[in-house]
Amino acid sequence: MKRQFWLVGIVLLAVLSACRSKSDGPTDTYSSGVISIAADESFEPIIQEEIDVFESLYPLAGIVPRYTTEVEAINLLLKDSVRLAIATRTLTEEEMNSFHSRKFFPREIKLATDGLALIVNRDNPDSLLTVRDFSRILTGEAKDWKDINPNSRLKSIQVVFDNKNSSTVRYTMDSICGGKPLATDNVSALKTNQQVIKYVAENPGAMGVIGVNWLGNRSDTTNLSFTEEIRVMAVSAEDVATPANSYKPYQAYLYYGNYPLARPIY
């Protein structure tokens, strides 16, 4: 996914060049000026990395990011508080009409493909999961680990998200649960992806749902492994998960469409 994010730099250049003050001439150019952007917090690691590279290439340019929920990122764009919003969905017809009524004509550009990662405690022996069973867990049909694996010694499944207004919650409700509401007794939301990782690392029965960008192993310069604090589950689109048909959210599996919990970034 990282390789596709060179588009972010191009988008930032385009946004900078489009910014104009009310003075006689432009105050922002392709290589100078300051803009504010908003991004879903699940993308913070990769977006911040791209901003750092961009600003090192263009020292007179400044990008002021605001990492928040997807809902808030879109709202900030609607209120003209930021020049760019990075999210996992396009604008709705109502949102687009709001812009058009004010003579604004925003562009939607697909930047990359992201993946949702399912993480569990390192003491949890379960490493495979089907999309169907993931849906059963989210809707409350499967509440204990034995409902997924009869041999499991763990008890209840505690699912934790980063934020109730995040793109991960919306994606699971729309794309995994088919619009059904999430269970309220075993599904909860914290505030950030980092808090989810910490919670899962400390609770054997927990399952975290986070953006794959937060799982990078800082000691691995090849970016081919995940953080060792937790375990990343392999997910299958088939009825029965096996090592042969289950995939972890590595870049190659996202790119070729093998990983079933993939989503676009706009």
Predicted ranges, named:
Residues R107-L111:
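Conserved catalytic cores of soluble enzyme domains
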Residues M1-S17:
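Sec-dependent bacterial lipoprotein signal peptides
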Residues T90-E94, K103-P106, P125-L128, P181:
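Peptidyl-prolyl cis-trans isomerase
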Residues H100-F104, P249-A252:
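Short acidic (Asp/Glu) patches
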